[in-house]
């Protein structure tokens, strides 16, 4: 059953020293099965079809080889936003949500014409969280990596935030080649 798969996988991950074995086992099974967490819980007594078990075996080997679960499943949740993640960007961490919360406060305090700069944006997690929760501001997200910018653009699109964001190539160690304007945050 799905529950048996979960219990076995959780145990394997714990033996391998994975701290968040419970969370990661559930995430990997949901990914392999295409189920939400709610569907996984509801269907826990059902038997998983062979293709799900085969995909799970591949995913588990990747995890046991040290690949982060977020890269295996290709997405991670940050401040209520589902974000695509690839090895081209850092995985959003829960402690970074503290920075996002403060940036949101500052952006809201800046008023309806506030401007926010998210430099070295990677996945765009901080800037996109600001754009989502401080709706009257404009956010400029910049990175030097074109691969990271592709991920950031995809995240802006999938979260419906392209109208309030500008995503561009910026080298944090160089003066900008074009005038970016003033920023409140």
Could you say what each language-model-derived stretch is?
Residues 1-41, 45-48:
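Non-catalytic accessory regions of SAM-dependent methyltransferases
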Residues 16, 32, 88, 158-159, ...:
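Histidine kinase transmitter module recognition
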Residues 3, 15, 22, 49-53, ...:
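Short, solvent-exposed loop/helix junctions and linker helices
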